């Protein structure tokens, strides 16, 4: 057989459930050259007419007949959540040859545009690459000029590193571009590989800008739990393939999608969970990510990868796949999950959620550092009554520190350790008395007082100075509602409408106002000096002109440094909100700041 690697399609008809007939389809082989030359493994890729998609939704589907026990780890991926997983099922496939009626994994939608646009914001605009080996044939059917035979073959692999420059031709064959092929854009991938090759402080300073580290850790965790063989996630060297890397369009950071897990449950039940050199570099950044990785392992075990949960599903799948003997893997799952629990306990000592700092002290500061302990089952730390975690500094694998806001007089706090599923792991009290002259910002002393969301277009003079878009002249004003106390605005941040954090050390005097400009230079050019209030010397518009206010209205949310809601309201560009604020040169002034009522604007 010499033509097995052809991707030419042949016309076909598909009958689904002996009822629905799809005419005008086309089919090609699917698999590596090792699978395509093996009739028991070869799969199929089927394309449907644009006006008659499979189940009304899928332009193409694939049938994977190789190692169908992979359905178990795919089930774990879906059950665990927050791990990219495809729309897979099991199917009985009747091929043209009468002796080739077999089961297979039905891949209704792989990581294609259909999946991306439903799973990720602007997902179809990202760039996706399949990390693979190069397989080259070693023989022909008749000398040098003969046709190449798929077997035997040789294999060439490379690490996830820069291959000698920025020429995309160096990367094309090991990182197969899977979408937006016309753009042929390898820049995000090359940036990822450059960063992966850094070391020491350079690596630690750069990796979070290029990689969604926590997402990678969860993908690594599920594949190491599943004992996947022949896979990027589970080998220190030699398995430089079977992974998908996706460059997210919203922030340019890379995501890691599990891919081609045929060899599920291949590695021993007592094998380790940190075999990969790239994984070890990530968790070596610091205790934040080491504990996060072990926390992901624990969460996946408790959510899905345990014999109690998977047992009924193994019996269910075994009814359809009797030759796979899936029931026999219940013992593997039990042994594997117990072993990994022990590895987690050995890596990070188990402690109860608690505060170790002394409670009841006095302070003249507007914030106070508080320390405590937490095990890997704690995903974040919150103040009771809030829905966002505090900014936590992990001192070591199970010791944390947070800064709490302090106001004049007694301050009582309830700190909660929150698990991966949002459950409360533990809750502790802490108190401090404030006796300083500066209060931390909160809803009782700070408010949004004015918004200029749709300025007039730039004048010719402004355009000549580089201020080419009206959004550059947007601004938001905050007011200190206290007539006697200074407010500390450090790390107060907008989390909806715009994404912006006020720099540390920013203070606002009693009754004073501060303007946060979209662009500092543009603001000064158009509005000059402020007579009443101060101008923050930081812009919220980013260098690409994004992160701006909506001209048609949106929700604005302002949080304190402790993630307490200061302001949360929505404005519109139509009545009953004042329409003069919509490109009429006027701003939207809130007569009762923080009140989501257009009659008060």
Would you name each region that the model predicts?
Residues 484-493:
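Short, hydrophobic/aromatic beta-strand segments
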Residues 43-53, 58-60, 65-68, 82-86, ...:
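Internal "kinase-insert"/substrate-recognition segments embedded within catalytic cores
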Residues 3-4, 19-25, 33-35, 39-40, ...:
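Middle-to-C-terminal accessory/interaction subdomains
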Residues 1-72:
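Conserved NTP-binding catalytic cores of kinases and kinase-like/nucleotidyltransferase enzymes
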Residues 420, 438-441, 456-474, 497-598:
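Solvent-exposed beta-edge/loop recognition patches
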Residues 365-367, 371-435:
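Long, low-complexity serine/threonine/glycine- and acidic-rich segments characteristic of extracellular
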């Amino acid at each position: 057989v010499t033509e097995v690697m052809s991707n030419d399609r042949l016309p076909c008809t598909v009958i689904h459930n002996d009822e629905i007939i799809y005419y005008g389809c086309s089919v090609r082989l699917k698999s590596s050259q090792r699978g395509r030359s093996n009739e028991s493994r070869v799969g199929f890729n089927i394309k449907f007419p644009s006006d008659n998609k499979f189940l009304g939704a899928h332009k193409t589907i694939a049938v994977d007949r190789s190692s169908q026990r992979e359905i178990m780890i795919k089930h774990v991926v879906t059950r665990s959540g927050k791990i990219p997983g495809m729309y897979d099922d099991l199917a009985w496939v009747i091929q043209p040859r009468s002796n080739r009626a077999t089961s297979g994994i039905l891949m209704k939608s792989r990581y294609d545009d259909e999946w991306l646009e439903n799973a990720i914001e602007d997902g179809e605009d990202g760039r996706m690459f399949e990390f693979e080996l190069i397989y080259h044939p070693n023989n022909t059917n008749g000398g040098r000029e003969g046709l190449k035979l798929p077997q035997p073959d040789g294999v060439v692999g490379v690490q996830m590193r820069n291959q000698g420059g920025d020429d995309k031709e160096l990367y094309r064959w090991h990182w197969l571009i899977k979408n937006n092929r016309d753009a042929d854009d390898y820049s995000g991938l090359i940036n990822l590989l450059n960063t992966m090759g850094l070391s020491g402080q350079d690596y630690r300073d750069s990796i979070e800008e290029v990689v969604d580290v926590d997402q990678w850790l969860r993908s690594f965790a599920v594949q190491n739990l599943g004992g996947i063989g022949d896979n990027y996630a589970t080998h220190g060297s030699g398995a430089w393939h079977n992974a998908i890397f996706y460059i997210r369009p919203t922030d340019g950071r890379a995501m890691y999608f599990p891919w081609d897990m045929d060899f599920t449950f291949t590695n021993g039940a007592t094998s380790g969970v940190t075999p990969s050199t790239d994984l070890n570099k990530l968790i070596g950044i610091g205790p934040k990510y080491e504990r996060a990785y072990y926390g992901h392992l624990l969460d996946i075990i408790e959510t899905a990868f345990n014999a109690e949960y998977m047992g009924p599903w193994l019996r269910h799948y075994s009814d359809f796949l009797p030759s796979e003997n899936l029931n026999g893997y219940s013992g593997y799952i039990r042994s594997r999950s117990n072993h990994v629990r022990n590895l987690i306990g050995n890596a990070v000592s188990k402690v109860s959620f608690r505060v170790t700092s002394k409670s009841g002290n006095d302070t003249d500061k507007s914030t106070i550092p508080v320390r405590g302990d937490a095990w890997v089952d704690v995903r974040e730390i919150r103040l009771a009554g809030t829905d966002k975690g505090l900014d936590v500094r992990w001192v070591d694998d199970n010791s944390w520190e947070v800064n709490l806001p302090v106001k004049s007089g007694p301050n009582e706090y309830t700190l909660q350790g929150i698990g991966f599923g949002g459950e409360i792991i533990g809750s502790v009290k802490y108190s401090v008395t404030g006796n300083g002259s500066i209060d931390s910002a909160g809803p009782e002393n700070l408010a949004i007082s004015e918004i200029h969301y749709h300025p007039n277009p730039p004048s010719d003079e402004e355009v000549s100075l580089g201020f080419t878009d009206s959004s550059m002249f947007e601004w938001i004003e905050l007011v200190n509602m206290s007539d006697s106390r200074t407010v500390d605005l450090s790390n107060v941040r907008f989390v909806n409408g715009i994404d912006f954090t006020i720099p540390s050390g920013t203070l606002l005097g009693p009754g004073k106002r501060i303007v946060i400009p979209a662009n500092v230079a543009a603001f000064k050019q158009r509005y000059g000096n402020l007579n009443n209030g101060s101008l923050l010397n930081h812009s919220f518009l980013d260098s690409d002109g994004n992160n701006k206010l909506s001209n048609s209205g949106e929700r604005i949310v302002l949080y304190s440094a402790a993630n307490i809601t200061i302001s949360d309201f929505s404005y519109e560009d139509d009545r009953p909100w004042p329409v003069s604020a919509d490109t009429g040169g006027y701003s939207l002034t809130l007569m009762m700041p923080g009140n989501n009522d257009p009659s008060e604007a």
